[in-house]
Amino acid sequence: MAPQLLLCLILTFLWSLPEAESNVFLKSKVANRFLQRTKRSNSLFEEIRPGNIERECIEEKCSKEEAREVFEDNEKTETFWNVYVDGDQCSSNPCHYRGTCKDGIGSYTCTCLPNYEGKNCEKVLFKSCRAFNGNCWHFCKRVQSETQCSCAESYLLGVDGHSCVAEGDFSCGRNIKARNKREASLPDFVQSQKATVLKKSDNPSPDIRIVNGMDCKLGECPWQAVLINEKGEVFCGGTILSPIHVLTAAHCINQTKSVSVIVGEIDISRKETRRLLSVDKIYVHKKFVPPNSYYQNIDRFAYDYDIAIIRMKTPIQFSENVVPACLPTADFAKEVLMKQDSGIVSGFGRTQSIGYTSNILKVITVPYVDRHTCMLSSNFRITQNMFCAGYDTLPQDACQGDSGGPHITAYGDTHFVTGIISWGEGCARKGKYGVYTKVSNFIPWIKKIMSLK
């Protein structure tokens, strides 16, 4: 009986096995879905290791919280996370004028230096004319706490309040033909060095110099005027200021009995083509001190106030080859123009110290020389109405016959008269500079004379 009972129990157990298996084990499809995961959990060893950004966020994709655990600093976490999510928005250096860029998610923020604003710090807040000339193309003045721009005669202020728009084709200071050529054709600026003290000269030369200049092509020096004496000879230069006014040096006027003017010429040997313009009146500054005069020996100095204006009988006809230079304001000339590297001088004077005058108009660029160096270089008094320009070692200068001619300084595309060729000690001598009448000191006088009927 016992063996039969044991057999029944074994059969019953074997019959129940398939049902038990189906209750304990899931089907493979369901089991795979249940066990699927995207990231394994850190092992106990990993959890106790110090945070490592490469392990947490480079080898695997991490969350912001995991990054924070690594840096343990909110600011560092934000900086990392902004780049981690969508790249560095500051990599292209979008902030202008040395602004500081801070990356964000899908954006960036620029922190601007004082006087700058805008998303990219691209807008300059010009609250002073001393900062970039107040962003003015021509003249700047301070009105209350802001800057106000204005333009030279024959220009209109642009709608942006900064630019200057020429009213006509022949507005002052426009060098149409040379605009894209001047930089390539003129010598590079040469830094002046300390002047060499030379043996004392007996007298300053009343007419200074264009030595080793370049030919000025037709229309590239359109403000150049030439003064002709009663013999038909060139004896001085001048600067066209208006249809009826030519600026020149006072010492030129007492060199001849009569004066005629030529404009628009670059080759004065062709007498058959040149047209002499008649002079109506000449205004010489009443304080001008001629050389070897009574006043020179008392309390004034030779060639001080060396300025004169010629009034024409008939208006000068402007063209591409004949354009007046712009007259600056006194502040603009002193604070902006005369702080440029260099100016431009031109003329038909001697090409060597003892050479002949040139039939071809010559032009050179001459660097401004600081006043202290200027005074050390000369054996003669440099007054407040004078300034120096030129090279102390490079043999380039103006020379006899150039006197009265233009010293021009460009600002942007506009050319302003800044000086009058006045005097020098020889021509292109080592350690010596050309001396020019400082036009900025005479703006009121010039305007007064030009306003006379």
Curated annotation (Swiss-Prot):
Heterodimer of a light chain and a heavy chain; disulfide-linked. PANTHER family: COAGULATION FACTOR, COAGULATION FACTOR X. Gamma-carboxyglutamate residues are formed by vitamin K dependent carboxylation. These residues are essential for the binding of calcium. InterPro entries: Coagulation_fac-like_Gla_dom, EGF-like_Ca-bd_dom, EGF-like_dom, EGF-type_Asp/Asn_hydroxyl_site, EGF_Ca-bd_CS, GLA-like_dom_SF, GLA_domain, Pept_S1A_FX. This is Venom prothrombin activator notecarin-D2. Glycans are attached at residues 92, 254. The lineage of its organism: Eukaryota, Metazoa, Chordata, Craniata, Vertebrata. Residues 41-86 form the Gla domain. GO terms for biological process: blood coagulation; induction of blood coagulation in another organism; proteolysis; venom-mediated blood coagulation. Its main location: secreted. It comes from Notechis scutatus scutatus. Is classified in the group D of snake venom prothrombin activators, since it requires the mammalian factor Va for maximal activity for the cleavage of prothrombin. The venom of this species does not contain its own coagulation factor V-like. PubMed:12403650 describes 2 isoforms of notecarin D (D1 and D2). We chose to name this protein D1 according to the masses indicated in the paper. The modification 4-carboxyglutamate is found at residues 46-47, 54, 56, 59-60, 65-66, 69, 72, 75. Residues 1-20 form the signal peptide. One of its GO terms (molecular function) is peptidase activator activity. The active site is at 251 (charge relay system), 306 (charge relay system), 403 (charge relay system). GO terms for cellular component: extracellular region; extracellular space. Pfam families: EGF, Gla, Trypsin. Snake prothrombin activator that attacks the hemostatic system of prey. This protein is functionally similar to blood coagulation factor Xa. Residues 21-40, 182-209 form a propeptide. Residues 210-451 form the Peptidase S1 domain. Its EC number is 3.4.21.6. Disulfide bonds join 57-62, 90-101, 95-110, 112-121, 129-140, 136-149, 151-164, 172-326, 216-221, 236-252, 374-388, 399-427. It is found in: Secreted.
